Structure formats: C-alpha cells, structure tokens
Amino acid sequence: MRTRKNRARDAKIRLGDSMATMMKERLACTVAIAALVIGCVTFFYLGLGLVPVYIVGGPGLLAVFFWYRTYLKQPTDPAIIVPLFLITAAGFEIHLVEEYLGHYAPTISRLFNIGWTDRVFVVICFLLAAALCLVSVGLYYRKAVAGFVASLFLFTRLAEVGLFVFPLLRPALQPDVAHPISQSVASGTFVGDMPNHYWRITGSYYFPGMYTVALAILPALYTLYRVWQARPSVTTASVSQ
C-alpha cells in the first residue's frame, strides 16, 4: 500500500517538475523573442527612423503576447492555420505588386526622408516570399518559432491601414512639388523618382497599395480570429462542456 502511495507521490512530483520546467522554458523563449523584437526595432530605428517602429514595433509586441497565449501553449492544428496563413500570404503578395508598380518604396522615402529604393523593395519581397514558404512548413510541423513568425506576419498586416493615413501626411522632402524628385536622403542614399502623394498638392487621395490592401488585412484578421478561438483554454472549455 505504501509502495503505491509512494509511486503516486513520485509521479505527482515528476509531473510538477516537468510542468515547472516547461513554464520556465516558455518564459525564457518569450523573453528572448521579445528582446529580439525590441532589438530589431531599435536597430532599424537608428537606420531608418520611426517607420519600422510603426510597421514592426507595435505589431511585434502584440504578436509576442498573442503567440504566448495561443501557439506557444499548444500549437494550432495545421489544418486550421496553414491554409489560412497561405491565403493571407498570397493576398499579401498580390498587394505587393500594386505597391511596386506605384513605387511604394521611393514614396515612403520622400514621405519620411529615408533610403528605400525600388531595388531594395524587390529584394525584400523575394526574401519575404521565401521566408513565408519556410514558415508554412514550420507551422505544419508545429514549430514554436514558426508560430511566432506567423503571428508577427499577421499582426504587421494590420499595420497596412497606415496606407489610408499616409496621403494626409506632409512629405519630408519638397512637399510642395507635385512631380517626382530624385535626390539623396538623410542617410546619404540616393533615391530616384520619388513620387508625391500628398493629397493637398496632388488633389487625389491615394497611396501605393491602397486598392489591394484588403487582400492582406482581411485574411490576416480571420486567421488571427481562428487561431485565438483554437487556443487551449477555449478548446478545454468546449471539451468539458
């Protein structure tokens, strides 16, 4: 009888130790990811200004919280997240085509006096497409890091609403000149053919990517909703009922 009690007690101790170790690992992973996001935002801020803080900073911290509450505790079923993630990625790639054709990078350069060129934009787009393919594989195999990168990608898509604000902002470089300009920006990079989409000067309310932005935002919102609904607490509650 004592042997059974001892075994049960030992099993409880091992289970408690295992759960404590798991919680420590999760916390350490979360802290490391949060530090990485803050470090990257700081690095890009020093080189490019406030734009990366808006695009990556806020969404990045939200992604850390979301990932911790959902995917890190229990990876989302690949049957749920992988198709939705790929649909979002496809819509985003179509959205990038409009941005490229509208010279999004030079327009941003003129707006904020930073060194983004069409060439850099294309390189980033190709690298991002490759990264999204790898992330989808990681989601299929339920990898925690893939879950975070997917969360970051989805939340940064919500930052696309800034496209509706940018036409209202006065450009940092020659705001009163309607035609494209070519010059060196604050970082010393030469950027050619920087359009002006300031609505007070052009008379039109548009910014590159505005027409197709819904293709990136709506699937991202739905994916976040489905992942949140599938989080462990909701699943457990539904099973107990």
List PLM regions with ranges.
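Hydrophobic cores of alpha-helical transmembrane segments in multi-pass inner/ER membrane proteins
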Residues: G57-R69, F126-C133, Y211-R226
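Membrane-interface helix-boundary motifs at transmembrane edges
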Residues: T70-V82, G138-V145, S233
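Membrane-interface loop-to-helix entry segments
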Residues: W116-A129, S204-A214
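Short, highly charged, low-complexity non-transmembrane loops/tails of multi-pass membrane proteins
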Residues: P232-Q241
